[in-house]
Regions:
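Core catalytic lobe of class I
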Residues: 2-232, 236-245, 249
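S-adenosyl-L-methionine
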Residues: 4-24, 254-282
Length: 282
């Protein structure tokens, strides 16, 4: 079970309409276990897709993340390069998210369709890492001989076998958001992608921040995996697919409440320990 400092109590398990830089200043130093965020990429002319100044963002990120916390940010194209170079000291590696549906059909006769996005992982010290194992065919290749001239030093004889469990690699496949139901946001990420990342980089009861939470998918991911969350969304100039004006904060809250109702009683009790108004059942 995570431990909350007094300053964060009013923020935990809620979604706030605010400028994320200003709101993050209210979060206590070194109190967040994971930042999981789908930042604006700056790929469109929409006001909500404007890139947040990364130097200012990193100042707050580095202040609020725990020394062994993970900062996990989705990205694509040139924004990936900008993101990596914005903090080379903390950047560690990328994960490729292979999507079920491609994009870029307007340029299909000029360029390949785009079927992946990237996930950039940053941290100060080695964070929690729970590799999400998959199952393959068991094998036993016998005993490996001495290897005394390898690039990584000498190896003694060892039996090479597996019961079938396979460690994850840096390419992961998840269906896009429409496979999970209604899509509320133009860049909505799938809840299952978020659950995979939350399980990988946090433990039960930890706190996850999404400072540009959109329609709340990553917050739901945290909730379903027994983690606490803080969501921030500016909610500025929000028109769903250039149609009716919407409030993504209200959409997030509605989706989170619906997800909360699917939890078992033990999971609900874990959340309501912190008396979040968001989870009051009627």
């Amino acid at each position: 079970m995570g431990f909350f400092r007094l300053q964060n109590i009013k923020l935990i398990n809620n979604v706030f309409k605010a400028d994320c830089i200003k709101k993050m200043k209210l979060i206590e130093t070194e109190s967040i276990d994971m930042i999981l965020c789908d930042l604006p990429y700056g790929h469109t002319q929409n006001k909500w897709d404007s890139i947040i100044p990364l130097d200012i963002l990193w100042k707050e990120y580095e202040r609020i993340i725990k020394p062994n916390g993970a900062i996990v940010l989705t990205s694509s194209g040139m924004f990936t390069a900008e993101l990596m170079l914005s903090n080379p000291k903390l950047f560690k590696y990328k994960i490729i998210w292979e999507k079920s549906k491609a994009t870029n059909f307007l340029n299909a006769k000029k360029q390949p369709l785009r079927k992946y996005e990237e996930i950039c992982v940053f941290y100060k010290k080695q964070p929690t890492y729970n590799p999400q194992m998959s199952m393959g065919v068991p094998y036993n290749k016998g005993t490996r001989k001495n290897q005394l001239t390898g690039s990584y030093g000498d190896f003694l004889p060892v039996e090479v076998k597996s019961e079938g469990a396979r460690y994850p690699n840096d390419i992961i496949y998840f269906k896009t958001a429409e496979s999970e139901g209604k899509v509320y946001h133009p860049t909505q990420k799938p809840i299952e992608l978020g659950r995979y990342l939350v399980k990988t980089y946090t433990n039960l009861g930890d706190t996850v921040l999404d400072n540009t939470c959109g329609s709340g998918s990553f917050l739901i991911s945290a909730l379903l995996e027994g983690r606490n969350f803080i969501g921030i969304e500016k909610d500025e100039d929000s028109n769903r697919f250039k149609a009716d004006s919407v409030s993504y904060v209200e959409i997030s809250k509605k989706r989170i409440k619906e997800a909360y109702l699917t939890l078992d009683s033990e999971s609900k009790e874990r959340i309501t320990l912190y008396k979040s108004k968001l989870f009051k059942e009627r």
